[in-house]
């Protein structure tokens, strides 16, 4: 199981424990590119950001918050480890039951990129996440990183939930960088072809 439910302490309250992101694991195709998260991408966010634990990235379903002590977030050698003390509410209890059955067993995170790197590998465009701001960590139904143990984020939800004017501008800049990298590679290939002739 990718995410576990543990009952700890005298009151045996359940905790949601897992990895919201794994380092060096590639996402599914995110619309012309894949992402990979590098070690250190969360270092500053874990120290500074006000992070919520949400269900499916939905701000109507808050499971915990690091500033209130109901969410613990740490970056270790494996990835972004989380521990949530969920509220004793009907919807949270229903979620826990679904997780115990194995219906929901993957995680994700909502973020804004502070530093990234684009490159091509084996004909695929890759985006390395080097430094990010965190909004949320979430148990999710549909993650983007199918091959990872914890799976990182729900593609559809992140794009729908976090399209602010700033995000759109950052995405446009990232797309420009990706296209610039593609043009640069094509120019290098053209230069090599010219030298061969």
Language model features with spans:
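Polar/acidic, low-complexity leader/linker segments enriched in S/T/G and N/D
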Residues: 1-48, 161, 170, 180, ...
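A surface-exposed loop-and-adjacent beta-strand signature within N-terminal beta-sandwich domains
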Residues: 58-68, 75
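Residue microenvironments linked to proteolytic maturation
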Residues: 6-9, 15-17, 52, 70-170
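Flexible loop/turn segments at secondary-structure boundaries
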Residues: 25-27, 60-62, 116-118
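Short helix/loop capping segments that flank catalytic or ligand/cofactor-binding pockets
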Residues: 26-29, 63-64, 145-148
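Charged/polar low-complexity intrinsically disordered segments, enriched in acidic residues
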Residues: 154-197
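Short conserved beta-strand and strand-loop elements enriched in small hydrophobics
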Residues: 49-61, 107
């Amino acid at each position: 199981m990718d995410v576990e439910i543990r009952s700890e302490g005298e009151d045996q309250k359940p905790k949601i424990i897992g990895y919201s992101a794994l380092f060096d694991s590639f996402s599914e195709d995110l619309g012309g590119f894949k992402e990979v998260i590098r070690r250190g991408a969360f270092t500053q966010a874990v120290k500074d950001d006000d992070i919520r634990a949400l269900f499916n990235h939905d701000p109507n379903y808050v499971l915990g918050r690091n500033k209130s002590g109901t969410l613990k977030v740490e970056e270790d050698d494996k990835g972004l480890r989380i521990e949530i003390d969920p509220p004793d509410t009907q919807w949270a209890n229903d979620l826990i039951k679904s997780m115990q059955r194995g219906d929901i067993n993957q995680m994700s995170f909502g973020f804004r990129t502070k530093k990234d790197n684009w490159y091509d590998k084996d004909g695929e465009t890759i985006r390395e996440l080097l430094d990010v701001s965190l909004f949320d960590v979430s148990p999710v139904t549909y993650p983007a990183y199918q091959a990872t143990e914890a799976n990182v984020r729900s593609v559809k939800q992140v794009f729908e939930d976090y399209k602010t004017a700033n995000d759109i501008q950052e995405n446009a800049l990232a797309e420009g960088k990706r296209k610039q990298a593609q043009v640069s590679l094509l120019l290098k290939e053209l230069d090599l072809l010219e030298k061969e002739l």
